[in-house]
Amino acid sequence: MRRWSVHLCAFVVATALGGAPVVRAADMTKTLRVAFSTAENGFDPQAAYDSYSFYVIGGIFDPLYAYDYFARPVRLVPNTAAALPEVTDQGRTYTIKVRPGIYFAADPAFKGKRRELTALDYVYSLKRIFDPKVRSYWVYIFEGNLVGLDEVLASARKAGTFDYDAELAGLRALDRFTLQIRFRRPNFGFEYWLASNQFSAVAREVVEAYRDSSNRVMENPVGTGAYKLKQWTRGQRILLEANPDYREVVYPSPGAGSDAADAAIARGLAGRKLPLVGNVDISIIEEAQPRLLSFDSGQLDYVALPAALAPNVLDGAAVKPEYAKRGVVVHRHVTPSIAFFYFNLDHPLVGGYTPEKVALRRAVSMGYDRGEAISNLLHGQAIPASQPVPPALYGHDPKYVAPYGYDPRAARALLDKFGYKDRDGDGYRELPDGKPLTLVLASTTDNTARANDELWKRCMDALGLRITFLKNKWPELNKMSEAGQLMMWGLSWISSVPDGNDYYSYFVSRNIGTLNDARMRLPAFDALYDKSRDLPHGPARTKLFDEMNDMIYGYAPWILANYPYENVLAQPWLKGYKQNPFVQHQWRYYDVEPRPH
């Protein structure tokens, strides 16, 4: 979820150009069957924020770039761009050629005409990120650096509207198929953002035909991608069908950077026109057990194995014999994501920056048993988190040592020191001024969340802290979180790009209401973050990251929990599947053979 939410999140669909002659187009008699654990929010690339919406967006829309399907470490390749970006002026200017001959899916908004993709579509789409009505999460990527943007943003925020026709010096179409993006300072690694689905192209005609009061188009997605939306029952089912206007793209042959096993994955598929399967049928199945049962009965072609059910399926890193006998395989890696709990620093009970408030948050953090959560709730399908940046991303420091971890004795001593004591003898502490102290943790309604609630209750009881739980579905809790209405909540962020700088944007004050759920306001942290954005990956930037890590532990806006494994179970009839750390659900590359009856 967006944050998984999600950070946000890449969710791009990679492409390959060239290769063997095209054999045949999508087989409309074939259906790929998939399940999501959480309901989607909507399918507007610039307005979406949760992982599950972006999975669908990745099938319908196109960013300029993608990742080579097979190469590891990941490598950028052109998608709708004609070539990799020309980067000049010491990383300040990106010039990109859009490939001619790419068309949007047919839609009444185009009034019967074929609509070609142009550089202006990317200019318009990126401008939507800056529209205050859209309330896009992604403005922080540009704010303070894109040439001319800060003045435009200030004017738009004051007026409440955005002038899409006004000149923006840092974002221009030089001609019909040439896009130029200019920054005030070097923007190292920006090319990876150009492979993110939030930077996909939408057509202005579609937005103006279907937009809501927020200038969002969540329900009428029209893109240039491999699929188009056929049917949507919100929170229950999403049906996609192959886009007949999709350009000539074929399944790639493994090349440089591919694994030895990739030849077998591509066998019989290389050179075939994408997408391979004509239909994608997505069900929303929130509970873990029914999802696994659907997979076991052959109703799903692949499924992300819920950690709570890992003992039923896995023996270490391999599937158990009964699954192996059926031909089921597991694809496994540590995801570029972090699970955490946050405190709302605006909340009168747990928020604030005074010593006693910081002490309360630190004590709660030291009292939550992450090890038990990983062992008993996640059944070992995660590793402890030491810093916001997950392993395998640029910026993760394996030498960084967390200042504190699970230590209930130290937590109780800290609470005692700052006056959190049980004054009425009921077994629970009060605030230093004697007023009641009750922690309220937001929590979803599924069985996994209930098990975590029980762990939280045991841990807080051991500290003498009363805790209750606010139960609701994820989309509703997310809205409340954005509005600053929750005291505490647990989330995950998954990376859109292979660079870790983004993980510190979740603590920057200007991102309150979008990325910064903790609503932290520390000018010193903001300054370190802005300084880090001007540096390439290397020791100097890592030193700044470690300073920010120390501040995060010092003020305790988050309880850093874990970096989860992703275990994807695949049926023997699913072909062409290759796991990617930054791209999930690359449906156009998947094929299904006839299922056994």
Model-derived features: positions:
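Non-catalytic accessory/assembly modules
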Residues: 117, 136-160, 164-201
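N-terminal lobe/hinge region of extracytoplasmic solute-binding protein
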Residues: 35-89, 222
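Positively charged n-region of N-terminal signal peptides that target proteins for export
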Residues: 1-4
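Active-site-proximal polar cores
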Residues: 561
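Bacterial N-terminal signal peptides
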Residues: 7-19
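Short structural boundary motif marking the start of a folded domain
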Residues: 28-32
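Extracytoplasmic/periplasmic ligand-capture domains
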Residues: 26, 69-70, 85, 93, ...
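Sec/Tat signal peptide C-region and signal peptidase I cleavage site
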Residues: 20-25
